[in-house]
Amino acid sequence: MDRTNTRSEGNRQVGIVASYDFTRREELGRWFPPDVEWTMTFTEEVPYRDNLELVSRLGRASLLTRPVRELVGRGAEAVAYLCTACTFVDGVAGERALREAMTAYGVRRALTTSGAAIDALRAVGARRVAVVHPYQEPVDQLLGRYLKDSGFDVVALTALGLDSVEDAYSVAEQQVVDAVVAGDHARADAVFVSCTALPTYDALPRLEARLGKPVVSANQATAWALLGAVGERARGAGQRLLEHRPTLGA
């Protein structure tokens, strides 16, 4: 268990379960206001041979039992499972099942990164979406299917071209910027940057100004939705999503 900020009486409390390999904690914290207590815990490590096996194993509800109950025991009013592919790998029904399991473990408001991304894209008025991601096949196609089944027209699906899933952990912000600019599409209402391993906080305002449309990232959407679930707002100057309220908000 990792307590990320100091508890003060009366503060809203939220919790995050991150996949064991999550490395962007410091960046994620930039979206949280100082008067919200947020606590992060991690899943157990899982063995895997490829991208699909990794996210499939991390997408099992049983993996969330211990960390979710720990967060609930510490007073979390809402909990998010912070992992994109882990929460879309089994489709819309699988994402819903994860939230239902989290609720069964005692969470009052349960969210996932993939579910938050859908809410975020709808909030900015997107119907046609360009997607940038670090995945290998067939995980990329599962992402496209998840978005389509959620009501979006995926007009472009652009990979970062990484050789392995581990390479996502060392992607630099400029690589993300270059990939989003290259992966945008004239017909897209918004761009979605999938994967919580990618750095996006400082890139989002630059990209939105350059492209003239909303750019939503996985970590941004998760923080936005989780904070909205307890009636709070995420911080981030020049990020269009943050002008809107989540539909799951309190």
Explain the meaning of each model-derived region:
Residues 61-74, 175-188:
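Short, well-structured alpha-helical segments in soluble
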Residues 12, 36, 105, 109-123, ...:
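Hydrophobic structural segments
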Residues 17, 77-82, 130-131, 188-195:
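Periplasmic-binding protein-like
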Residues 217-250:
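C-terminal functional extensions of proteins
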